[in-house]
Amino acid sequence: RKHRRSVMNRRTFIKASLTATAAVAGSVLLDGALSSASAVTVPNTTEDAKMKILVLTGSPRKNGNSNTLAEHFINGAKEAGHEVTRFDAASSKVHPCIACNKCGMNGPCMFKDDFEVVREHIIPADLVAFATPMYYFGISAQLKTVIDRFYAINGEIHIPKKAVLMMTYANNSPRNESPILTYYEVLLEYLGWKDAGRIIVPGVWPTGAINQTPFPAQAFALGKSV
């Protein structure tokens, strides 16, 4: 029975993956009408609810613009009384998934590395926040490596959670946001998570450029309001 469940989970995963690939491939053909001006939030329906939050950062630049967003988000969440853990994918040792399937989508991974920290905190987390720069129209390789390893804990995180996306990129074309936004949306749909807010920041490239914008304050407000 356990083997049969694993096979069915894998089929569901593959089906969702194919849907995501098709969606991302198609999204770059559309003219973007996506807003980059503000954070979109879903108010917390439970007054004074305190959450466990895991923030996954993916910028290899220590003082990168997406890291700045993450830091302000964390400060806002802590001020609201939430318990926050940050995992920096860029400075951690996480081996890429090699599709060996030894984990069976719900078991120990063959690689014993820093992903164990993610496993420890993401399973009980009420909200998972992703912070990444756009690299070649996708999320950073460092963050993608961590997300790929979700495969080994699929059965434990395929439960209702909230999620937040914070993304920065250098140009000013909303159309270029589409691949990452589509990826994020399909990921949440597959996992059964609910979007709690997004902060998408165009036109920032040099380190520190985001400090001259209103977006760090928006990240703080989002962290405080989730």
Spans of features found by a protein language model:
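Short, Lys/Arg-enriched N-terminal segments with co-localized hydrophobic residues
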Residues: 1-7, 46-48
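N-terminal beta1-alpha1-beta2 submodule of the flavodoxin-like/Rossmannoid cofactor-binding fold
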Residues: 17, 21-131, 137-153, 208-209, ...
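N-terminal secretory signal peptides and thylakoid transit peptides that target proteins
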Residues: 6-21
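Short, glycine-/small-residue-rich phosphate/pyrophosphate-handling segment
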Residues: 158-197
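A short small-residue
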Residues: 51-54, 164-165, 199-206
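Short, internal active-site loops enriched in acidic
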Residues: 92-93, 171, 204-205
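Cofactor-binding loop segments of dinucleotide-utilizing enzymes, especially the Rossmann-like FAD-
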Residues: 58, 89, 167-170, 201
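Short beta-strand elements in bilobed, periplasmic/extracellular small-molecule ligand-binding domains
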Residues: 83-87, 193-201
